[in-house]
Amino acid sequence: MVIVLQPASFDSNLYVNPKCKPRPVLIPVIDLTDSDAKTQIVKACEEFGFFKVINHGVRPDLLTQLEQEAINFFALHHSLKDKAGPPDPFGYGTKRIGPNGDLGWLEYILLNANLCLESHKTTAIFRHTPAIFREAVEEYIKEMKRMSSKFLEMVEEELKIEPKEKLSRLVKVKESDSCLRMNHYPEKEETPVKEEIGFGEHTDPQLISLLRSNDTEGLQICVKDGTWVDVTPDHSSFFVLVGDTLQVMTNGRFKSVKHRVVTNTKRSRISMIYFAGPPLSEKIAPLSCLVPKQDDCLYNEFTWSQYKLSAYKTKLGDYRLGLFEKRPPFSLSNV
């Protein structure tokens, strides 16, 4: 059954920086059944902080079902959706991204990956949707937890990280602070003169993010030379993004990828992003096995809770890690 989504009421003066010209580039594609997949993953994390995954083991019917249930929710009358908002941070939200004035052409649902910790807002989401929606969300979160821990295990093996599970444990434990976000970018009634912001440029603060969308374009990543690159959508695959926390723990060897979504189509876009985060009390610092000399560490130690709070106080596109970088000692020779 095809459902036509009702465009929400959004501001339309959100334009992309015209100095950023998207260009084609070959995004790494990694087949998880390949014998050298872990080597490819590490290379992609170093060069792009981003890669596409095929043969991931997640059932296609689960992806289709969750997408359709998300479409059904976003098609509800705004009076019903608004009962699950504004987000706290979980729940339903529109247009406003965070508390610091960032705006986008979207509406979204944000859910705690531990559904036992439901808020009043997330309870309202499932109250107005069929039970199959919650069931699909629960199974999807289970699959994302499996996949995120698998990726980190492969990184551990390739980099010979000790002790074992130093990274993957952070997303496996029940205290893991992970979440699932479902975004809906409504179709445009008129073709815009220039590209508009759906979700502004940013990096993700967690360890890694697993992104899956329908076949509508819009996602872009920023490569090393500062150029924005269009990512060709593929509804059957996942895209993995390195987050700030993994950048710190690898002492900058992996780079968290700056990305954004632009709306330049009459087709609506649905995306689902699983943010795999560590426990709130976890101490985050460069891994000693990767940085034998303490003086070579680029970042000071902090807890995930501290970083999360700091990120919450910033604008979407701010460089959040700057507050936690080690500064070279002051010297008169530098004056």
UniProtKB/Swiss-Prot annotation:
Per the Swiss-Prot or TrEMBL record, the active site comprises 269
UniProt pathway annotation? Plant hormone biosynthesis; gibberellin biosynthesis
The record's similarity note reads: Belongs to the iron/ascorbate-dependent oxidoreductase family. GA2OX subfamily.
Q: How is the cofactor bound?
A: Binds 1 Fe(2+) ion per subunit.
Q: What is this protein called?
A: Gibberellin 2-beta-dioxygenase 3
Keyword Transmembrane applies: no
Q: Which gene is the coding source of this polypeptide chain?
A: GA2OX3
Which species is this record about? Arabidopsis thaliana (Mouse-ear cress)
Task: Give the Enzyme Commission number.
Answer: 1.14.11.13
